[in-house]
Amino acid sequence: MSHKIAAVCLLMSCLIATAYSAAKVPISIYYESLCPDSAKFITEQVYPAVKGELRDVVELTFVPFGKSQFVTQGSEVTFTCHHGPNECYGNKVHACAIEHIQANSYQVEYTRESLTMDFINCLMKAGKNFPDNVYPGQRCASENHINNWENIKTCANSTEGSVLLRKAGESTMRLKEPLTSVPTILFNEQFDKKVNDRAQVNLVGTICQYVSAPQPRICNQHNGASTPSLASVSAILSSLLGLWFIRSFY
C-alpha cells in the first residue's frame, strides 16, 4: 500500500512540475521592418504587453522577413523586399540585432530579451520617417542601452546579414500555412487564423488564454480564456489518480 501511495505522489509531482516548466507561452511574430501594420502591432500591442505584467510568461521569437523573396546564386543572395531596398536593409538590421544583442552584466535589469524588444520597438516607431534619410539604428541603440551597435551595423552590411535574413526567409517559407499577410502571429508554433486575427487587436487577452494559473492580474480583465488553467488540470489529475488509487484495492 505504501508503495502505491508513493507512486501516486511521485506521478502527481512529475505532472505538476512538467506543467510549471512549460509555463511560458511561445509566440512567433513574422513581420517586415517598414510595414505600417507590423509597426502598429509591435508598438501598440506587443511592446506594452511584454514590458508589463506578461513579460515573464511569454517567449517571443521575431522573424523579420514577411513577404520578401530571395534568390541564391552561388554564395550571393539577392533579396527583394515588400517595401523596397530600404526594408531589406532594415530587415537585416533586425536580424542582426536579434543575433548580436547581449545583456549588460553591469545592468542586470536589462536582459537580452528586454534590450532586443526595446530596440525593435524603437526602430518600428520610426517607421519610414527617417530624418535626413538616416536609418535610426544608431539612435535607437543609444537610446536603449545597446552597447554594440557597431557590431550590428557591420553584420547588416556584410555577408552575415544576408545569411541571417535568408534564415528568416527560410523560417517564413516553412510555415505550414503560407504567409499571406503581415504581421502573422503563431502561438505554440501553430498558426490559427482566428487566433492571429484576435491577437492583432487584443494581444493581452489572447496571451491570457494560453497562460496557466496563477495568471497575472491583468488577465482578470479578460475572462474568455479557453485553455484550462494549471489549477484546473491539477484538480482533474488528482481526481483521476484518486479513482485509480481506490480501484486498485478492489
UniProtKB/Swiss-Prot annotation:
Q: Where in the cell is it found?
A: Secreted
Residues with glycosylation annotation: N157
> What residue stretch is flagged as signal peptide?
1-21
Task: Answer whether the UniProt record assigns the keyword Endoplasmic reticulum to this protein.
Answer: no
Q: Which domain of life is it from?
A: Eukaryota
Q: A cellular component term (GO) from this record?
A: extracellular region
Posttranslational modification: Conjugated to URM1, a ubiquitin-like protein.
Null-mutant phenotype, please? RNAi-mediated knockdown in the fat body or hemocyte of flies infected with the Gram-negative bacterium E.coli results in an increase in bacterial load 24 hours after infection.
- What is one Pfam family matched by this protein? GILT
Q: Which UniProt keywords apply?
A: Glycoprotein, Immunity, Secreted, Signal, Ubl conjugation
Q: Which GO terms describe its biological process?
A: immune system process; positive regulation of defense response to bacterium
Main localization of the protein described in the UniProt heading: secreted
Q: Which GO terms describe its molecular function?
A: oxidoreductase activity; oxidoreductase activity, acting on a sulfur group of donors; oxidoreductase activity, acting on a sulfur group of donors, disulfide as acceptor
* Induction summary: Up-regulated following injection with the Gram-negative bacterium E.coli. Up-regulation increases between 1 and 6 hours after the injection, then expression remains at a relatively steady level until 72 hours when it is strongly up-regulated.
Provide the family line: Belongs to the GILT family.
What does this chain do?
Involved in the immune response to bacterial infection.
Question: What name is this protein filed under?
Answer: GILT-like protein 1
Q: Gene behind this chain?
A: GILT1
